[in-house]
């Protein structure tokens, strides 16, 4: 059974996409529109990682329709859209700087629907949302990790390669966004329709490194 993965980002078109929609913030409302071209390329590079050696059905929730920021309400609308389309996993290589009730409620609905959520989080520093919400798998970049390697930095916080790959090329850019993409890539290597707690256990067992990244050399756990 193939995973159905909702990518909430800037990407609006992919061969693997079974549905796509754009969520645009207007005064006092969120408009659902036809998805368009990726204005930044970020979401497309994330999609390259998610679909690398994986057969997945993508749902594209385009919340970055320009090079500017998105809103918590737009992300929440995209999450609800993904739930309605029976996403197994929602991937968010993004983080908002403040808690928003509308976003917290949407995340709660996704968790109640047994949808796994993977969201980018900084390895250090202030919390970001939706990664800070209970039940969300937090993911970040870890320079110790090569592509497809994982670290367990803390309970429920996983690190992975901090670089994005696109069309056979590797970019030095990425950080937490790239790490989150590689964590989702690891999740969808396993069977679909599994509980989030089982996914966390599987990621923890797979981790090559345990504990926070240090500036000194690290020894793998296995």
Residue positions per predicted region:
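Mature extracellular/periplasmic domains of secretome proteins
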Residues: 1-2, 70-91, 100-115, 125-140, ...
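Structural detector of well-ordered beta-strand residues that form the stable sheet scaffold
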Residues: 59, 116-118
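Active-site core segment of subtilase-fold serine proteases
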Residues: 1-56, 167, 211-216
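Short glycine-rich anion-binding loops that position phosphate/pyrophosphate groups of nucleotides
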Residues: 11-13, 94-97, 123
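Gly/Ser-rich catalytic serine loop of serine hydrolases
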Residues: 32-44, 122, 170-183
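Extracellular S/T/G-rich loop segment that most often corresponds to the catalytic His/Ser-adjacent loop
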Residues: 9-14, 128-192
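Subtilisin-like peptidase catalytic core
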Residues: 32-96, 206-210
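C-terminal subdomain of the subtilisin-like protease fold in secreted/lumenal serine endopeptidases
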Residues: 1, 7, 88, 192-222
